[in-house]
Every structure is written in structure tokens, then in C-alpha cells.
Amino acid sequence: GETGLPVILSCGMSTLGDIDEAVRAFQETGNDRLILLHCTSSYPTPSSDVHLRKIESLQQIFDMQVGFSDHTEGPVAGLLAASMGACMIEKHFTLDRNLPGPDHRFSCGPSELAALVKGVVAAREMMGDPKLGPTEREGASRNDFRMSCIAAKSLPAGHRLLSDDVTFKRPGAGLPPN
């Protein structure tokens, strides 16, 4: 805390009490640049033990940025974590999975890391805007894809409409179906 540098605090193997104690101790230094890292310290971590919802729990409880320490095989957990608001993804990296040591066999290689980064960028973009309503692109093509209520056949003026007299077709530039 004295340097003012950001600190990344892994929550692997920690209870809520452990995390709370560490966060409080850190905050007492006056440095507010702390990121909690949701982590399952199991190598590799099976899907059933990832528990990505803990990211949201940590965000709500501590009201701070939360990242994800990914020890799974493949990119799925990292992509999901990004879509759930993880501010950073930590992923083990190797140039060769056959190297000795416990981390290499589940680490990602250069092409996988590039794909993960590209996927995280796309996932964040896909999260979009929570505001309901058509997007700008949808608005531009709305009339082309929506339907209008139209006469199913030629009808004389003053004719009393029956259900067989109308149909619905594109484009939606006419009378709306509602």
C-alpha cells in the first residue's frame, strides 16, 4: 500500500472472513487500488469447480473490481468471466505444454492466448447496452422486417371487414398489426 501501486489479491482457498480481513488490512494503508481475483486453486480446475458467480458475489460484497484467475483448460471460463464483468483475466501461458512443471499441461499457448484476448474483446462488446428498444441497425431495417396489416384481396369501399379480408405481409410500412 505504501507505494500506491495497484495490488491484485487472489482469493483462492480463502474464506469470506479471510478475504474481508485482507481487504480491510489493505484499505488501512490508504491505497484504494485493489483488485480481487476470484480463483479456484485446483490445477486444472474442472468446470464444476469454477463457480463464476463468485465474481458477482465479490463485487457486491466488497464494491470493488474483481478479476478471474483461470486455471481451466480452454477459453470458455475466461470468456464467461469477461461477460460477467471480470475486470481482468489471469491465465497461465506456455510455449510448450510438454515442458516439466505442474502448470504447462493446462496453460494456453500463443495462438490460444490470442484467441482468448480476441474473444474477451468480443464478449465485452456483445454485452452491449441494457436499455431496451431497437438498436440503431434494427431501427434502420425495422420497416423491412416488420409486418403490416393489408387487404387480402380487392375490397369495395364501405365493405365490412372480416378476418378473411386481411393478411399480414412485409414490409411494415403500412398499418401496424396491433
Residue ranges and their predicted role:
Residues 1-178:
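Catalytic cores and adjacent flexible loops of soluble metabolic enzymes
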